[in-house]
Regions:
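Charged, compositionally biased N-terminal leader segments and the immediate start
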Residues: 1-22
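Accessory alpha-helical DNA-binding modules that contact the DNA backbone or grooves
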Residues: 14, 24-231, 252-254, 273-282, ...
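Two-metal-ion RNase H-like nuclease active-site motif
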Residues: 182-184, 370-374, 445
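Arg/Gly-rich low-complexity intrinsically disordered repeat tracts
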Residues: 291-302
Length: 606
């Protein structure tokens, strides 16, 4: 096992022990052990295990050292397996309900016999949770809302998690000899934060072998549909995938149609009808009567659809009726439009902009020159400073911004003033050493306290290259209070960036109440950058705000909020948000070269 995997097991052991009401010192020992393991370089961990010296490390000891060595060597731990077996499976599931921790779960189990989601739901609906000391009616309401959200969330999946699944399937489809073209479609192709299912469009010379390959994919739990040109499967993860096979001349039309969105497709069909054409997944063909440039009634759309359906089969190229296109750019051109990137197809003005030639040149991954808001083992990160910088350098980045947690984030090992000063000195020495070509900026993810003050004093903040101000506590404030709190932090002269504006955790936690418009206006007025937090669970500030905000002058920075080297790749999902928000390269701070970035931060510090 790697150090990260070992730490995950140790943290799970701590949770299980807490659920079983074991000695708190024992719980803390496993939590501390996980942090120590995270702080090792992989090579150092290997050396300590091989030499039998783990027990000599402060915070580990003999018994824990043996368990870590067992995990590192065999990939499993008998103690862990027995502990899991001793706890009802539903108890771990309860930890996924927002607001429930081990202590509350223990009370619910002892007082109300709660052992899983079903018994918790019943206890809430009967009002028994509200009667418990330390809970009350509001807590009961929050628990029920959390259960409801969890059920809704369970039908969706993070873009980041399903994108590699889709890529693997597309690659496999393209390798089949019968397949001429294959692409993913749907919300995944549009870069939407969460995805309900996967859609694949394929042009093939022979259908049956392709369908058979698809339904036989590894991890398929159930084949939910199988027809002559379609198939649907559900994976063991709950993710559903749909396959549609079309003649090659219909491929582009099907790809456009099933990419969506629904609103975009309606506008495209209206535009086609206004030109005497019918646009569908089958093709682009003349209809009997055309409308005007104004909005076309839905009855006209229905008539056009019926006209397509009444044909004996999909129109083929060469019959002098269907427009022949080789790609989506030609499809848009046939309707007098510039190509609309999939990320923009949400029915929010992209068709009009494409007609006027006003679509932006969207930011791309290759435009990024570095990043900010990254954590190390100094707080709750899983890799050391040097490991993180080496990973940034391997990506070709010119700069890398450290931003470990501030002192009030005790749960994340936030840095005291003394520890932060030590880190600033360490970064300065690393830059001076010439060990890396990538320049390191010293920073902090500084807590915005409940009253809007920052977590460090001005003198210490002035020693940093940049400051990311973020809310990490007291999420229950009303909208006016939370908005004023964040604006006060924005108005602090040392604040460089605002972190994760709404605090949402996708599929887990709703955003706190905040007036995003007022916060955006305050950021613009004070020259504060608002980050696109690219963590797949956050993607905050969300794309729907960015077009108008950027037009007003708001500057963004695509930050991964990385806690380990592999998470630097999260910027890919942040680029999705930026593109969906119509952002150009020049509207994203970390597309700038090192020189201009250093100068900007120098001037910002005053």
């Amino acid at each position: 096992m790697t150090k990260h995997e070992i730490a995950d097991v140790l943290n799970e052991i701590a949770l299980l022990l807490e659920l079983k009401a074991e000695n708190p010192f024992k719980v803390r020992a496993y939590q501390a052990g996980a942090r120590v393991v995270e702080s090792f370089e992989e090579a150092e961990l290997q050396r300590l295990v091989s030499a039998g010296e783990l027990k000599t490390v402060k915070g580990i000891g003999d018994a824990l050292g043996q368990k870590i060595a067992e995990l590192h060597t065999t990939g499993k731990l008998e103690f862990h397996e027995k502990l899991k077996a001793s706890v009802p499976p539903g108890m771990m599931e309860l930890l996924q309900v927002p607001g429930l921790g081990p202590k509350k779960i223990k009370v619910l189990g002892e007082k109300l016999g709660v052992v899983d989601i079903a018994t918790l739901t019943k206890a809430c609906e009967e009002g028994r949770v509200a009667e418990l000391a330390g809970f009350g009616a509001k807590t009961q309401e929050k628990i029920l809302a959390g259960i409801k959200n969890r059920e809704a969330y369970g039908r969706r999946h993070l873009w980041w998690e399903v994108f590699p699944v889709s890529e693997t399937i597309v690659k496999g489809l393209r390798a089949l000899p019968q397949v001429k073209r294959a692409e993913s479609a749907g919300s995944l192709r549009r870069g939407v934060e969460t995805v309900g299912d996967l859609d694949f469009i394929v042009a093939a010379t022979d259908v049956e072998p392709v369908v058979e390959w698809f339904v036989s994919l590894a991890g398929v739990k159930e084949v939910t549909a199988r027809g002559e040109t379609k198939a649907s499967v559900r994976f063991v993860t709950g993710l559903q995938a749909d396959l549609r096979i079309v003649p090659e001349e219909q491929f582009v039309f099907a790809l456009h149609h099933f990419t969506g969105s629904k609103d975009h497709n309606v506008q495209m069909r209206q535009r086609a009808l206004a030109r005497g054409l019918s646009l569908s997944e089958w093709g682009l063909s003349p209809v009997a009567e055309s409308g005007s440039e104004s909005a076309v009634p839905s009855s006209k759309l229905q008539e056009a659809d019926e006209a397509v359906k009444k044909r004996k089969g999909p129109k083929r190229a060469g019959n002098n009726e269907s427009v022949v296109v080789a790609n989506e750019a030609e499809l848009f051109k046939a309707l007098g439009l510039a190509f609309v990137p999939p990320e923009l197809r949400e029915g929010v003005g992209e068709v009009e902009a494409a007609e006027k030639g006003e679509l932006p040149r969207l930011v791309e991954m290759t435009d990024l020159r570095g990043t900010f808001h990254c954590h190390t083992t100094a707080s709750d990160g899983r890799n050391t400073l040097k490991e993180m910088v080496a990973a940034a350098e391997a990506l070709g980045w010119a700069y890398f911004g450290v931003a470990d947690h501030s002192k009030s984030s005790v749960q994340a090992k936030g840095l005291t003033e003394e520890r932060l000063l030590k880190q600033i000195a360490e970064i300065a020495a690393l830059n001076a050493s010439g060990q890396f070509k990538t320049h390191v900026f010293s920073g902090t993810e500084c807590d915005i306290l409940p009253d809007g003050r920052l977590d460090y004093d001005d003198g210490l903040l002035a020693k940093l290259d940049y400051v990311v101000a973020s809310v990490h506590s007291t999420f229950s404030q009303d909208e006016a209070t939370m908005t004023a709190r964040i604006i006060r932090a924005i108005e602090h002269p040392r604040t460089t960036m605002l972190g994760h504006l709404t605090g949402r955790i996708l599929l887990r936690r709703e955003p706190y109440k905040v007036d995003a418009r007022k916060v955006i206006d305050a950021a613009i007025a004070n020259g504060v950058i608002v980050e696109i937090n690219a963590s797949p669970w956050r993607l905050d500030m969300e794309w729907k705000h960015w077009r108008k905000a950027a037009e007003k002058g708001l500057l963004s920075s695509i930050n991964p909020d990385a806690h380990e080297t592999g998470e630097l790749a999260y910027v890919r999902s942040g680029v999705n948000v930026a593109r969906k928000g119509w952002l150009r390269k020049e509207q994203v701070f970390n597309t700038r070269e090192l020189g201009p970035v250093r100068e900007y931060l120098r001037k910002r510090r005053g």
